[in-house]
């Protein structure tokens, strides 16, 4: 099986690494080695890898920029594929097709520079378009579902195009959340004409707010927990006296209790233990069971 993988990589010019530390490919900077890490540069290469993995029965996982991901300390005994960044293609003046591996924050800036509204909320979000579609990423009153009109994914049955309605978007979830074997290849967004200066000012404001309120100076996976109905996870955690709570190198941020940060040398086990501690304490004191937003690579 591994011989076929190496042959495919050689034939298609795909960069293939053996034993690459996943800590270098996640924003948490945590994780042991991947047996194989593939870095395709095109959608065709990504599809070829997915098809080979399925044919050969390879245990595999697809990641973007690892911004909401916790990789195991023991690593990943299989193939990790990172989605290619590629480049957006404008289909008309307001409609753009964007590869799954493209930066959400970069797309937001690109749209604003062209005077197009609908994605300013994504300024500063460290994830990719694919991850954003999967979890219906959002902030400051905006979310992916506001502008996404379609996406194309790779499924075990072949390529499939989904309309906006077929994504079944909800808070931090989509149809992709329920079908982990559907891999987003690209999305199509329809934006609205806006005032360029106003959009750039809005983005600058969002950026300043993030820097002021979020612990961007430490590695993390963003918000550790989903927002419970009618509540804020960070506020509940703070009210339970858990700001600054620490397990090993993992800590509930003192700046924003909704974040778990890597203070240095944190392990996956540290983070998972801290998540459980926070869940248990918050549920005991408030009756609310917090649902993690961080995904664990399996």
Could you tell me what each predicted segment is?
Residues 56, 63-65, 147, 218-219, ...:
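Short, basic and Ser/Thr-rich N-terminal targeting/leader segments
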Residues 69, 108-111, 119-123, 136-143, ...:
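A generic local secondary-structure boundary/capping motif
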Residues 80, 120, 152, 294-295:
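Residues embedded in well-ordered beta-strands within globular domains across many folds
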């Amino acid at each position: 099986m591994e011989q076929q993988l190496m042959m495919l990589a050689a034939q298609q010019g795909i960069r293939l690494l053996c034993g690459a530390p996943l800590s270098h490919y996640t924003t948490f900077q945590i994780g042991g080695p991947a047996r194989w890490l593939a870095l395709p540069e095109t959608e065709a290469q990504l599809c070829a890898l997915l098809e080979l993995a399925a044919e050969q029965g390879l245990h595999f996982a697809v990641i973007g920029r690892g911004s909401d991901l916790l990789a195991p300390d023991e690593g990943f005994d299989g193939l990790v594929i990172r989605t290619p960044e590629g480049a957006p293609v404008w289909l008309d003046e307001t409609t753009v097709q964007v590869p799954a591996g493209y930066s959400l924050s970069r797309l937001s800036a690109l749209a604003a520079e062209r005077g197009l509204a609908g994605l300013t909320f994504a300024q500063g979000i460290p994830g990719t378009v694919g991850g954003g579609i999967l979890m219906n990423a959002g902030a400051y009153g905006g979310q992916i579902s506001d502008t996404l009109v379609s996406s194309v994914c790779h499924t075990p049955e072949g390529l499939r195009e989904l309309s906006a309605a077929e994504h079944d978007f909800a808070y931090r979830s989509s149809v992709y959340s329920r079908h982990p074997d559907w891999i987003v290849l690209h999305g199509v967004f329809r934006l609205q004409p806006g005032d360029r200066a106003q959009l750039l000012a809005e983005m600058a404001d969002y950026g300043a707010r993030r820097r002021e309120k979020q612990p961007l100076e430490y590695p993390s996976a963003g918000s550790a927990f989903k927002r419970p109905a009618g509540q804020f996870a960070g506020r509940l955690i703070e009210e339970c006296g858990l700001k600054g709570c620490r397990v090993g190198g993992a800590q509930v941020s003192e700046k924003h209790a909704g974040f778990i940060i890597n203070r240095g040398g944190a392990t996956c086990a540290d983070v998972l233990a801290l998540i459980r501690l926070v869940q248990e304490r918050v549920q005991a004191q408030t009756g609310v069971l917090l649902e993690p937003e961080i995904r664990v690579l399996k």
